[in-house]
Amino acid sequence: MKTIIVFLSFLVLVLATKFGDANEGVNREQTKEVIQNEFRGDFLNEMAAMSLLQQLEAIESALLEKEADRNSRQKRCNGKNVPCGSNHSPCCSGLSCEETFGYGWLYKSPYCVIPSNG
């Protein structure tokens, strides 16, 4: 009786080992396929996210550029009777940089004045 129990135990052990390895091989293949599919899916999702990120950055830079243009002030300019020339800021619109008799002879530089007609 003990011999039969030992023999059956041995038979069960051999069968379990044989079919266990077969299942383990199948499990390894399935695991490998799942991992490859997950990485492929993650890679594709990451590529789509990167593409979307690049599109958003392009839109953002265009909007920021428009806003910077809209909010930018006119550069500083000189008003009436203020020195102008190469070392000074330009005259404001409606004024021209001319040599005048009033201040120019003393300071040796042209001044922003209302343009003369003649």
From Swiss-Prot:
Primary localization class, coarse = secreted
Q: Which UniProt keywords apply?
A: Disulfide bond, Ion channel impairing toxin, Knottin, Secreted, Signal, Toxin
MF terms per GO, please?
sodium channel inhibitor activity; toxin activity
So which tissues is this one expressed in?
Expressed by the venom gland.
The text the record gives for the protein's domains is: The presence of a 'disulfide through disulfide knot' structurally defines this protein as a knottin.
State the similarity comment. Belongs to the neurotoxin 14 (magi-1) family. 06 (ICK-Trit) subfamily.
UniProt-recorded name of the protein: U16-barytoxin-Tl1c
Instruction: Give the originating organism.
Output: Trittame loki (Brush-footed trapdoor spider)
Q: What is the lineage of its organism?
A: Eukaryota, Metazoa, Ecdysozoa, Arthropoda, Chelicerata
